[in-house]
Curated annotation (Swiss-Prot):
PANTHER family: UREASE ACCESSORY PROTEIN D. This is Urease accessory protein UreD. HAMAP family: UreD. Belongs to the UreD family. The keyword Coiled coil does not apply. The keyword Cytoplasm applies. Keywords: Chaperone, Cytoplasm, Nickel insertion. The gene is ureD. GO terms for molecular function: nickel cation binding. Its main location: cytoplasm. GO terms for cellular component: cytoplasm.
Amino acid sequence: MTQAYDGFVHLGFSNRNGRTISHKKYQEGNSRVSADNSDANGVPYYFLINMGGGFVEGEQYQVTIDVNKDAHALVTTQTPTYVYKCEKGQLTHQNTSITLEENSYLEYMADEVIPYLRSRYFQTSRIDMDKSAHLIYSDGVTAGWSHEDLPFQYHYFRNLTQIYQDDELVYSDQTLLEPQKQDMFKLGYFEGWRNYNSLVMVSPNIDEAFVKALQKHLENLNLESDFAISSLDIPGLVLRILGKTAEDNRRVIYSCADYFRQEIHGLTPLNLRKNDMRR
């Protein structure tokens, strides 16, 4: 067992004769990975699994993903990330490290975090990618869970995502929520909604015309959630979503990802075998 972590996963993907294979699959502690062969395009597809059903106060987790030159992989979580209540005020932490080599492509579609009563959680993600690589990265957080079904009963949630290209920081996004100190329903926070998600896409094929076409495509779908798309300073975009349910938000996320897959890579729509997204 790696001493520093309660759960550890390391996945590596390589291109062999025009086909992506998993050359590394390592798991320790409470963390597991499970392969799925349902992707119609033959892309390696893995679920991240927590054997305890969620994170316990003070636990530390690490996810490492390496995608080598010309390889393409899809990684998602089996369920939302449940962060159980904290009785001693200890911080629970998960770190994700991703490396994308030349012309590689990773779709990392994490479900939302559901923080429990009084929980304290810090999530960090660092993506190091070649300028020719393609990335879809999503995550999110909800109003949480408590026995009384009251929203925002957790104490601390922080999510820091950073993307580097050739060792230069090109994207940094931080969400800091302290519901005991902030009015979570006011403008700039959840604004009456209960679920927040974001999706970042980085690709040399994304330009302003693509962003405008995607915006129009999503507007024509009559989706339930509120969302906004912004271009990045590099070829890419960020999509932010507020919705009534996690399922509503995922429909926006997958619609966006499907558009990119089809228009840029000629791939079929995602089929992540989630109960709310079966096709």
